[in-house]
Design a protein with these regions (language model features):
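RecA-like P-loop NTPase motor core of helicase/translocase proteins
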Residues: 1-170
Length: 170
């Protein structure tokens, strides 16, 4: 990544705020990270996730030392983001981008894994990823296992392409 001051400032702020919210505990804290098209949001987010992973291990005052991630994106954008991050972390292996069929569903998301999910597979009527069946655990079950069995917090990244279409069904 090029050393562009506004990007570095955004990465540092995103890293610090995320760790502060993780240390608060509880659920569903929100950070909104917006930047114009072409500003490098994916690159900055990628670097922030790497920084979060490093700093949680290094800080003595962190509530957690490890974290798991779920990255939601609409249409085929999750595949593009997956490929970008797989390329970015290919050499360092600091974080491990994975697709739903690549994780051990009986165990959940492992520390440092980024699970890439198509938003429509969760939010549309067919919502295949949130229904239990004989072949696959639901995303809810995988998240539960991740949190309960590994005591890992999950940071959800809602890709900016979802801005108008990704509305929570709470």
């Amino acid at each position: 990544m090029k050393n562009i001051p506004y990007q570095q400032n955004a990465i540092n702020e995103l890293t610090d705020k995320t760790i502060r919210l993780l240390n608060l505990g509880g659920k569903r804290h929100k950070i909104v990270f917006e930047a114009p098209t072409g500003a490098g949001k994916t690159v900055m987010t990628c670097q922030a996730l790497a920084n979060i992973t490093d700093e949680l291990k290094e800080r003595g005052d962190s509530r957690y030392q490890e974290v798991a991630y779920i990255w939601f994106a609409p249409r085929k954008l999750h595949l593009q983001s997956y490929a970008s991050l797989k390329n970015a972390f290919g050499e360092t292996r600091k974080l491990r981008p994975v697709m739903f069929d690549e994780i051990d569903q009986s165990e959940g998301i492992q520390p440092g894994e980024i699970l890439f999910v198509n938003w429509e597979s969760v939010n549309k009527e067919s919502n295949v990823m949130v229904r239990e069946n004989e072949s696959f655990a639901s995303l809810y079950e995988i998240a539960r296992r991740t949190q309960e069995e590994y005591d890992l917090p999950i940071v959800a990244i809602i890709d900016g392409g979802c801005k108008l279409n990704c509305v929570s069904k709470e």
